Swiss-Prot record:
It comes from Candida maltosa. It holds the Pfam family Ribosomal_S13_N. It comes from the Eukaryota. GO terms for cellular component: cytosolic small ribosomal subunit; nucleolus. This is Small ribosomal subunit protein uS15. Belongs to the universal ribosomal protein uS15 family. CDD domains: Ribosomal_S15p_S13e. GO terms for biological process: translation. One of its GO terms (molecular function) is small ribosomal subunit rRNA binding. Keywords: Ribonucleoprotein, Ribosomal protein.
Length: 151
């Protein structure tokens, strides 16, 4: 998929393993993987960080293959899911950082333009999450209260 606000084509991507079952050398049970996911979530890690740790330290290529559920679904069933979706959270965090930079550097026109692009992405993503009922229908991004969302 191409980039939203630049000319990049985005041709590089990772290949998902074709096999839909756990490899023969994999010894962990699905309950042990779920326990690991819950343990890392309680430490405050995001779902993607949990997936990276499971891949690198425990040899779990995909949690869905081993457990039957994705990491976020495991977190939701245990009441540990983040209140904001991860991609929206990090966009808001980036917008807060750019806005803080602009308070110190008022003449930085490029950062002002980039902030507009970031906030456009936030509004677009929030509209999507409202339509699929991940966010409540009256949820709205406001730059004044954004720092409270990511704190």
């Amino acid at each position: 998929m191409g980039r939203m606000h630049s000319a990049g084509k985005g041709i590089s991507s990772s290949a998902i393993p074709y096999s839909r079952n756990a490899p023969s050398w994999f010894k962990l049970s699905s309950d042990e993987v779920v326990e690991q996911v819950i343990k890392y979530a309680r430490k405050g890690l995001t779902p993607s960080q949990i997936g990276v740790i499971l891949r690198d330290a425990h040899g779990v290529s995909q949690a869905k293959i081993v457990t039957g559920n994705k990491v976020l679904r495991i977190l939701k069933s245990n009441g540990l899911a983040p209140e904001l979706p991860e991609d929206l959270y990090f966009l808001i965090k980036k917008a807060v950082a750019v806005r803080k930079h602009l308070e110190r550097n008022r003449k930085d026109k490029d950062s002002k333009f980039r902030l507009i692009l970031i906030e456009s992405r936030i509004h677009r993503l929030a509209r999507y999450y409202r339509t699929v009922s991940v966010l409540p229908p009256n949820w709205k991004y406001e730059s004044a209260t954004a720092s409270a969302l990511v704190a």
